[in-house]
Curated annotation (Swiss-Prot):
Cofactor descriptive note: Binds 1 zinc ion per subunit.
UniProt function note: Binds to the 23S rRNA.
Name of the protein in its database record: Large ribosomal subunit protein eL24
Key words of the record: Metal-binding, Ribonucleoprotein, Ribosomal protein, RNA-binding, rRNA-binding, Zinc, Zinc-finger
Any one GO MF annotation of this record: structural constituent of ribosome
Positions that bind Zn(2+): C7, C10, C33, C37
Quaternary state and interactors: Part of the 50S ribosomal subunit. Forms a cluster with proteins L3 and L14.
Highest taxon of source: Archaea
Signal peptide: none
Gene behind the chain: rpl24e
GO cellular component terms, A-Z: ribonucleoprotein complex; ribosome
Zinc finger (C4-type): 7-37
InterPro entries in the record: L24e/L24_sf (IPR038630), Ribosomal_eL24 (IPR056366), Ribosomal_eL24-rel_arc (IPR055345), Ribosomal_eL24-rel_N (IPR000988), Ribosomal_eL24_CS (IPR023442), TRASH_dom (IPR011017)
SMART domains: TRASH
Amino acid sequence: MARWNVCSYCGKPFEPGTGKMYVRNDGRVLFFCSRKCERYYFMGRNPRKLKWTKAYQEARLQRGGE
């Protein structure tokens, strides 16, 4: 069975054959589950400031749950 990918921006797992794989010039591979995640990454948006990302939820737990 194929391995599920995890979005490099929002942290959501998604099925193989969906999403997009982006390879940077330095060889780092980024996976995006949606066009929304891809756009936000290239616009430089911080995933820790967006409530729908896993990074936000993890940062919130570290701060004490506010």
